[in-house]
Amino acid sequence: MRNLPIIALDFKSADEVHTFLNKFNEPLCVKIGMELFYQTGPALIKSIKKRGHDIFLDLKLHDIPNTVSKAMEGLARLDIDLVNVHAAGGIKMMEEAKKGLRKHNADIKIIAVTQLTSTTERQLHEEQNIQTSIEEAVLNYARLTKKAGLDGVVCSPLEAKMISKELGSDFLKVTPGIRPKGAARNDQQRITTPEEAKTLGSTHIVVGRPITQSEHPIDSYHKIKESWLS
């Protein structure tokens, strides 16, 4: 996966995606989430790859180990660069996910979601019944992910530094919750700017609405790209 900002393609149809991508004349890194993949299926991945873009397939698989392994065997046949599971599924599930993926593809990176960037500490305590800080909960899931042999995690940029310190800078930290200065928070809770994410140790950033819903998406993308790569 190239070290470019990953654009979250939060659209409802393939037509909307292609209308958006037609604005760009350069290779991009894009994220296809559940909403879009379940609407369009593998056909959209093929058409995006023909354009020369890198793809993060963000399905956050979480099921019994055998089911996730078989699902990954199918996803391994797609021309994607990065895929993920939920770390809450446990070490065995993550190990089987990687085994399923590797049966057909040795190049796709696989990472695990720690805590969603929309999660608050109140939700962590009251709804998930995890009685630690968000930081400790995220670090615990990151440790399990590393032990399972995966390539990295999805986390907030705010947790990237401590994960790098304990698990190494090469361990991927793919971080959503990125907002340029002055941008709306939306449903994200633990957010930073692209510059802050880089300083904190993020290896990749994911940006959606500040680009896709911008009146000038190309300009917005290039500003974020410049601040991330500078």
From Swiss-Prot:
Highest taxon of source: Bacteria
Reactions this protein catalyses: orotidine 5'-phosphate + H(+) = UMP + CO2
Molecular functions (GO terms): orotidine-5'-phosphate decarboxylase activity
Keywords: Decarboxylase, Lyase, Pyrimidine biosynthesis
Presence of keyword Secreted: no
Pfam family, one: OMPdecase
Enzyme class: lyase
InterPro entries: Aldolase_TIM (IPR013785), OMPdecase (IPR014732), OMPdecase_AS (IPR018089), OMPdecase_bac (IPR047596), OMPdeCOase_dom (IPR001754), RibuloseP-bd_barrel (IPR011060)
Positions with a binding annotation for substrate: 10, 31, 58-67, 117, 179, 188, 208-209
Entries under Gene3D superfamilies matching the protein: Aldolase class I (3.20.20.70)
Pathway: Pyrimidine metabolism; UMP biosynthesis via de novo pathway; UMP from orotate: step 2/2
A GO CC term attached to the entry: cytosol
Function field: Catalyzes the decarboxylation of orotidine 5'-monophosphate (OMP) to uridine 5'-monophosphate (UMP).
Quaternary structure, from the entry: Homodimer.
Protein name: Orotidine 5'-phosphate decarboxylase
